[in-house]
């Protein structure tokens, strides 16, 4: 279990990267916080896929230093859009009408006790659901051991190929796994995991991504 605790920073970093960029934009669009958290990973994977296609054409290597800042900028842009959206809804438009900004925005109305109880019970159920889903992996597996099936071996080698080749494109990024031939294969997961893996930690990072995706799955069910 201690080995899993040592990987907690990686899990938290993955969850931030999965949720934050899309969460801001979805909140700007008026979605609830639960729906925004549930749908945000799809936004992030869409952005990761778009970058993985664009970077080879721009001769940009696929690395944390080149991809993660774009995710961060997306979150900042979404936060700005959310702030403007909130201001527009609260003020009935963008004009201050001669009053201070704080007064124009107004004080957010606190949620009632019943709504707070619903939120707490919902997120509590999500936590329980995640622990139920994750416990067999946490209690029965060493994160340094690959999953004992043939398919994970292919996908972990795909992450290795991206780390070595610096190319995460679905149009040839995994060519080393196909005898050097450039074939189409969706690489969203591989590209994302490669942002958090080192050459000697692909298996551990892949296993941590399973925990992150469990959380996404449970939150999606709740939403």
Map each language-model feature to its residues.
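Hydrophobic alpha-helical transmembrane segments of multipass integral membrane proteins
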Residues: 18, 50, 75, 127-130, ...
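Membrane-embedded, hydrophobic transmembrane alpha-helices
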Residues: 1-118
